[in-house]
Structure formats: C-alpha cells, structure tokens
Amino acid sequence: MIDNHFTEIADLESLDRFVANLNGSAGVVFKHSDTCGISARAYTEMSKLELPIGIVVVQHARSVSDEVEKRWQVNHETPQVLIIKDGKSVWNASHFQVKADEVAAAAAKVDSEQ
C-alpha cells in the first residue's frame, strides 16, 4: 500500500503528468522496491518530506523504471531518488544515501537557483 504522501507513477503517462505538474518547481521521482529492506528504510525517509514525490514501485512498473533510466541517463538502482526540475534530473542518490535531510537540502538549493 502506498502512503497518501506519494503520487503513484504506474505508467509512462503518469510519469509525464507528474513531471508536467511540477510547473518549474523541484520534485522527486522515488524508485522503490517493495521487497527490499534498504528500500523500506528509504520509504520512511521520503515520507518525512514536504515535496512533490512520485513513487515508482519497480515490481509493478518496470517500464517506468526503464524510462527513468533512459530519460535521465542514470543507472538503475533501488531505492533511488532523482530530483527533477524543468524536466531534467539535477540530483540523484541511491541506497543508504537516500536521506530526507539531504534530499530536502538539494531540492531547496535547486529551487533557489532560478
């Protein structure tokens, strides 16, 4: 079950819609595995944030996960967080580097660089 804090990205249309709805602000694409303990910890971290967060559960949306890798030229990892601004990936982290305070700081920095 996905927390109400997240927007589920289950197909390419919902990925495009999520990115478009950011309207120039920074947002997060969070690739999550529902069978991984490290990903469960990252899920808890991401739940602390007050940012737009789109979640891709890789077991249910493999085509979306593949598109994230292709579109933003990042190697596939889970858990993985990408900060998206103006349709571009401007920051990313994976595994134990997925920490709420670091994601929030990176997003704030990106948003201040207008």
What kind of feature is each model-predicted range?
Residues M1-N23, E113-Q114:
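N-terminal leader/targeting and pre-domain segments
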Residues L15-L49:
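Local sequence-structure signature of Cys/Sec-based thiol-disulfide redox active-site neighborhoods
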Residues K31, L51-E67:
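Thiol-based oxidoreductase modules, predominantly thioredoxin-like and allied folds used
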Residues I38-E45, H60-V64, V68, P79, ...:
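Amphipathic alpha-helical interface surfaces
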Residues R41-G54, K70, K85, W91, ...:
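Non-catalytic interaction surface on structured domains
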Residues W72-K85:
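Structural micro-motif
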Residues K85-Q114:
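Non-catalytic, surface beta->alpha helical segment in thiol-disulfide oxidoreductase systems
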